[in-house]
Amino acid sequence: MKRVLLSVLAAATLCSGPAAAQTQTAPAAGSPTVVNRSGSPTDVEGIIRAFTKKETEFRKALNEYGFRRDAVIQTIAFGGQISGEYHRVSRFVFDDSGNRYEKILKFPVPTMSEITITAEDLEDLGGVQSFALESSKIHEYDFSYVGKEKIDELDTYVFDVTPKVLGDSRRLAALKKSKTPERFFQGRVWVDDQDLQIVKARGKGVPETEKQKFPTFETYREQIDGKYWFPTYTYADDELNFKSGQTVHLRMRIKFTDFERLRGRATVIEQGDESKDKDDEPAKPAPTPTPPAPRPKP
């Protein structure tokens, strides 16, 4: 039976359409109500091993799927008006050689003036990839069991996640100086107590630098083909504060739909906007799915 977070459907409905884009608010904002904070399952480490193993499986499985991505990133002016927008709609499919590529369906000229966003930024979900907590990386994190929470029809275990690098000043400084720094997830995850897999995450990418900031995002997942919990909706509404004194109010909404198992390799190339008749011309290489690491414009 297909299992789905009702919150995903509600949020997507509320945020569809141009008018709604001006009035939408973050779903489930603030601190959630968590029960059984003092108690804990008998095998917390076993639960962590189980859901991080599932993360590894999901990452590999997603490499065999095509899907549609609709990304809207907006800057918000004082008073709540939209001051700029980046809107990119794409379909990720496979060519005859098994390479997945991004076919741009809609990409009007961005109107942002405060920050710049590249195609590569769009692949970086708030600074981290969708499956940041896979088995090979759990040694990089500390997990703290918080309690149990019911989300719609699902009972979940709740964990706070902290990258160990934040406590290592020398390594942290080196990462910030790197031209291609590794990103980590810091935040909270909700794990389905039946399937032991992440169904929701809230957090951000770290470390940040003086010129590169990440919004706090919330990601919901949906069960695809009866077994894979893939991200289907990501939302952020946050202020990015740069050392220069500039503050940017950023709103982001990304939807993943129309998953179809096609098989292939996860080497992704990019194709042009259909509206510009460039469908048959592969462009520069690009990473796999997922949103932004905004940088202030000079």
Please tell me what each predicted stretch does.
Residues 1-4:
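Positively charged n-region of N-terminal signal peptides that target proteins for export
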Residues 7-16:
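Bacterial N-terminal signal peptides
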Residues 17-21:
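Sec/Tat signal peptide C-region and signal peptidase I cleavage site
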Residues 22-185, 193-200, 204-215, 223-233, ...:
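Structured extracytoplasmic
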